[in-house]
Regions:
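Rossmann-fold NAD(P) dinucleotide-binding segment
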Residues: 59-120
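Rossmann-fold dinucleotide-binding core
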Residues: 101, 106-181
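Conserved beta-strand segments of alpha/beta enzyme cores
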Residues: 27, 52-54, 94, 119, ...
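NAD(P)+-binding Rossmann beta1-loop-alpha1 motif at the extreme N-terminus of oxidoreductases
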Residues: 1-65, 89
Length: 293
């Protein structure tokens, strides 16, 4: 059984790594648009070799003969990938869209893939892809979700069907992200301001007392690292969240602010390691690199 992963970044590689360790592992191929960039192609090729994955140099080569397709690209590229795949009229049975995009975007993608004869499965990844890899909890939705959930379950993936309507899984993910990505932005704003004011210890102690069970210094340092590492991708996801809220008639005031802050941190080029750096250390690395926070 052949599986192709389109988009071989952090998520695509993690899924490939996990699946490759399964007894009933599919034969995995991948394609990433970065393969077409001479400055990045070697990185993609090496990552594929390390995982025993066949690296394809064109999308057409990647989808040819694949029974199942998984899309793990950026939110801004998800619809373009669906259009490109559907234009190839692939023989694949199903297309699992694991990208964080608005329900309306997924419904548009579904129309394209279904018209090309490929079942579309709205798939939402509900936790960080590490450390659980392919076993990270996922929600599935769509008229064929039950059928293809069995395929993923056979590979020991942790999936749950939440309905037959495309967009239902995405809605859950998008609205959860209002809180998750918004909390990242809030803690960044709080943590950096508190450190600038010289009162971070007092602020963190107060938060720890109000919300026992959460180490706010550790959480804030972790969130800062996530934003500087993945802020551009997170900003794209939050733009899809904004679309989702607007589709529901909810004014996305806070989420629009989250977009701006995530993108600013993602573009900062600051490199943090939350396992090694405290909140204070992370904050001062940011102060040294960024003019606007």
């Amino acid at each position: 059984m052949k599986l192709t992963i389109i988009g071989f970044g952090e998520a695509g590689r993690a899924i490939a790594q996990g699946l490759s360790e399964e007894a009933q592992a599919p034969e995995i191929s991948c394609f990433d648009i970065k393969t077409l960039d001479p400055s990045q192609s070697d990185t993609i090729s090496q990552a594929a070799r390390n995982l025993g994955v066949r690296n394809c140099t064109t999308l057409e080569q990647a989808v040819d003969g694949a029974a199942f397709l998984i899309s793990t690209v950026t939110a801004g590229s998800a619809l373009d990938v669906a259009k490109a795949v559907s234009s190839l009229r692939p023989s694949a049975q199903a297309f699992f869209d694991m990208n964080s995009v608005a329900p309306g975007t997924k419904r548009t993608e579904a129309e394209l893939l279904e018209a090309a004869g490929v079942a579309y499965v709205d798939t939402a990844v509900m936790a960080p892809i590490h450390p659980r890899l392919h076993k990270t909890p996922m929600l599935l939705a769509g008229p064929n979700a039950e059928t293809f959930a069995a395929v993923l379950s056979a590979w020991n993936m942790d999936v749950r069907v939440v309905g037959e309507a495309v967009g239902r899984a995405s809605s859950i993910k998008m609205l959860r992200s209002v809180m998750i990505k918004g909390l990242e932005a809030l803690t960044a704003e709080m943590g950096l301001a508190a450190e600038k004011a010289g009162v971070s210890d007092e602020v963190i102690n107060s938060l720890n007392a109000s919300f026992p069970g959460i180490d706010w210094a550790e959480r804030t340092a972790y969130n800062l690292e996530r934003m500087t590492t993945h802020g551009i991708r997170r900003a794209e996801e939050m733009e899809e969240v904004v679309k989702t809220l607007e589709e529901l008639g909810i004014t996305p005031e806070l989420s629009e602010g989250t977009v701006r802050r995530q993108r600013r941190f993602g573009e900062s080029k600051v490199i943090l390691n939350s396992d090694e750096l405290s909140l204070k250390q992370s904050a001062h690395k940011i102060f040294a690199k960024m003019d606007k926070f």
